[in-house]
Design a protein with these regions (language model features):
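Carboxylate-rich, polar loop motifs that coordinate divalent cations or form catalytic acidic clusters
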Residues: 1-170
């Protein structure tokens, strides 16, 4: 009898600590099934970059962010490729057509333009973002090289990174 009670106790104790699972689908929560990156920010929010928008999950509900024509505070492009939060809490979104900084206080996006040497905005495909030890961010683009970004002061400063390898290797 003692053995039976022990087995029942273990069964119910294990069941009580089991993880609940939930399947998120395009039909209900996600903007697209082609997921490029899943990122958990320092505040616990889960961000999901897809081919058709950016999805934010706060543990209770989803919010979907998409490009809105004529709205400079929306995503610059729906094809979100990469996400990154730096050590100071700046949250960056890299899309098929450029780089943006998310402001959680206003729930809006601000474009960080990358310019050719001629001064023309290149609308670069952002492929990766990482932080250097000195706090600068390296922005990898597809076919346009690597750029260094400083997020100090009121306006971000971005310039071509000086690396010991040619940018066409990136």
């Amino acid at each position: 009898m003692k053995t039976l009670l022990s087995i029942l106790f273990l069964f119910f104790a294990t069941y009580g600590y089991s993880q609940s699972e939930k399947l998120f689908t395009v039909d209900r929560e996600l903007s697209n099934s082609n997921i490029n990156q899943i990122y958990q920010a320092k505040d616990g929010v889960i961000w999901i970059a897809t081919d058709d928008g950016l999805n934010r999950y706060d543990g209770a509900k989803f919010s979907i962010y998409k490009h809105k024509e004529g709205n400079d505070s929306s995503l610059v492009d729906n094809n979100v490729r990469t996400l990154f939060e730096d050590s100071k809490g700046h949250f960056l979104v890299g899309t098929q057509r450029g780089l943006q900084l998310y402001n959680p206080a206003t729930d809006l996006f601000k474009e960080i333009p990358i310019f050719y040497q001629t001064g023309e905005n290149m609308s670069a495909h952002i492929s990766t973002i990482l932080e250097r030890k000195n706090g600068d961010l390296l922005i990898g683009t597809s076919g346009h090289g690597v750029y260094s970004l400083k997020l100090e002061g009121t306006e971000p400063v971005i310039k071509e990174a000086q690396l010991p390898v040619p940018s066409f290797f990136i």
